């Protein structure tokens, strides 16, 4: 799967989703080719932005604290994806639509891509712009979760897929807020 197909996956149930159904990637492949490299992006941007103009975001935090927060953020991000996959897997069983863990991991690996890419906005030292892009990325992540749940888990009802995507995104939002708190408090 190419990241170039990501925009169409936000708005369509086909495109990249059909490719993932036709040629399902292994968990190791998704982790190595999507999760690991893209998880490095927010940590690197926190390291850069915090070291250069961290006072714009949180006054009084030293560059060394930003650098430590970036490392903690990376570890937390890498741990969050398998936890989210487990949550999707558990949710699929609760609504009586059991899914393979591999499909759940694929959704958990693809859904945060907009959030990871949104870290590039940290090149702009403006908290309002960063927040606006973060909200847009969150909306795209919700759309990817919904379309991924509906398509990869072969859901038959829109409402159940939306319900599951909302629960998973809510948990993901909570995890994201915890990660942001790690960055801001550390």
Locate each region found by the language model:
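Helix-loop junctions at the membrane-solvent interface of multi-pass transporters
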Residues: 48, 52, 124-125, 182
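Short alpha-helical linear motifs
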Residues: 30, 54-58, 127-133, 158-160, ...
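Hydrophobic alpha-helical transmembrane segments and adjacent short intramembrane/lumenal linkers
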Residues: 89, 98-170, 174
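Juxtamembrane boundary at the C-terminal end of a transmembrane helix
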Residues: 174-186
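Juxtamembrane transmembrane-helix termini
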Residues: 18, 52-55, 96, 147-157, ...
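Hydrophobic alpha-helical membrane-associated segments
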Residues: 79-83, 137, 141, 178
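Alpha-helical transmembrane segments of multi-pass integral membrane proteins
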Residues: 36-45, 111, 169-176
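Selected alpha-helical membrane-embedding segments in polytopic membrane proteins
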Residues: 2-99
């Amino acid at each position: 799967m190419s990241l170039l197909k990501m925009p169409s996956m936000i708005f369509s149930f086909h495109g990249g989703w059909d490719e993932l159904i036709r040629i399902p990637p292994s968990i190791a492949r998704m982790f190595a080719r999507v999760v690991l490299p893209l998880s490095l992006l927010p940590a690197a941007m926190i390291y850069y932005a915090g070291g250069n103009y961290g006072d714009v975001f949180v006054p009084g935090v030293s560059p060394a604290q930003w650098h430590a927060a970036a490392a903690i953020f990376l570890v937390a991000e890498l741990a969050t994806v398998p936890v989210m996959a487990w949550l999707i897997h558990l949710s699929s069983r609760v609504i009586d639509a059991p899914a393979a863990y591999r499909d759940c991991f694929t959704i958990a690996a693809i859904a945060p891509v907009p959030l990871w890419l949104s870290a590039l906005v940290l090149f702009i030292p403006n908290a309002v712009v960063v927040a606006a892009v973060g909200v847009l990325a969150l909306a795209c992540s919700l759309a990817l979760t919904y379309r991924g749940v509906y398509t990869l888990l072969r859901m038959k009802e829109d409402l159940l897929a939306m319900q599951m995507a909302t629960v998973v995104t809510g948990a993901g939002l909570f995890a994201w807020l915890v990660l942001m708190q790690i960055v801001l408090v550390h």
